[in-house]
Regions:
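Local sequence-structure signature of Cys/Sec-based thiol-disulfide redox active-site neighborhoods
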Residues: 26-72
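Secretory targeting signatures
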Residues: 1-28, 45
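Generic detector of short, well-ordered, non-transmembrane alpha-helical segments enriched
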Residues: 8-9, 41, 97, 170
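Short, conserved sequence motifs used for protein processing/export or organelle targeting and
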Residues: 32, 69-237
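Long, charge-rich boundary regions
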Residues: 2, 48, 95-99
Length: 237
């Protein structure tokens, strides 16, 4: 039995945005939004464990290491064991090797193994300060027993529309992950936040100030990895 479906991460992405590049070290209190990173990796990749461990150092409250509280999350997309992870990598033609970490849908990208957290910190700081659309997200996940999860997302565009932009058109992805993955990296250690499946993966159109909700029942036994193994053994934490 795997300790897993620990976290559901949802991202609401827009195709057009303004970017901002910080000139000095910043506090995450200056962030306009939480930064989400997608780590493209493979179990056979020699340099991938360094990426995973440095991302985890940033995520966790480790003395002497950077910490962004609730303003940074990441998922490990292990492409050689998961078709949907492989397809997600295919969304980015400029992502051609392992490991590669993209931030907020490729707002920033860091490629190759990493000897420290420095390059990831810089990418997070830059991405976290970009001008962003004001969207409220409410995420709820309840265990229904066995391998069934009841998942819902509420989204509100907290801005007034304009004549040229009367609605907000975006894309929402909600990732079902294992905090301690069933898959091991090249060093034989479990991945952090290993991707299993999407709860939601779709376009959305939001009206100003109006809440829109999505809900689904996700069943682990209905989904498989590339080896034909399903996820009916999930354990909700």
């Amino acid at each position: 039995m795997k300790k897993i479906v620990y976290i559901l991460i949802a991202t609401l992405l827009v195709t057009n945005f303004l970017s901002f590049t910080p000139s000095a070290e910043i506090s995450d209190e200056q962030f306009t939004h939480a930064v989400f990173a997608e780590e493209f990796t493979a179990t056979w990749c020699v340099y991938c464990p360094s990426a995973a461990e440095n991302l985890m150092l940033i995520y966790e409250d480790v003395p002497g290491e950077p910490y962004y509280d609730d303003n940074f999350f990441f998922v490990a997309l292990i492409t050689d064991v998961n078709d949907k992870a492989d397809e997600r990598m295919g969304d980015f033609p400029d992502v051609t090797g392992y490991p590669t970490v993209i931030f907020d849908g490729n707002d920033e990208k860091v490629s190759g193994g990493q000897s420290s957290t420095e390059n990831y910190e810089q990418a997070i700081d830059t991405t976290g300060q970009r001008d962003d659309t004001d969207i409220s997200l409410e995420i709820e996940m309840n265990h229904l027993g066995n391998d069934k999860l009841d998942i819902s997302i509420g989204m509100t565009w907290d801005e007034d529309g304009s004549f040229s932009n009367p609605t907000f058109n975006g894309y929402v992805r909600a990732y079902i992950v294992e905090k301690i993955s069933r898959y091991n990296n090249y060093d034989g250690d479990p991945y952090h936040f290993g991707f299993l499946d999407y709860a939601f993966d779709q376009t959305v159109e939001l009206e100003p100030r109006e809440k829109q909700s999505l809900s689904t029942i996700w069943t682990g036994g209905d989904h498989q990895d590339k080896n034909g193994n399903d996820f009916s053994d999930i354990d909700y934490d």
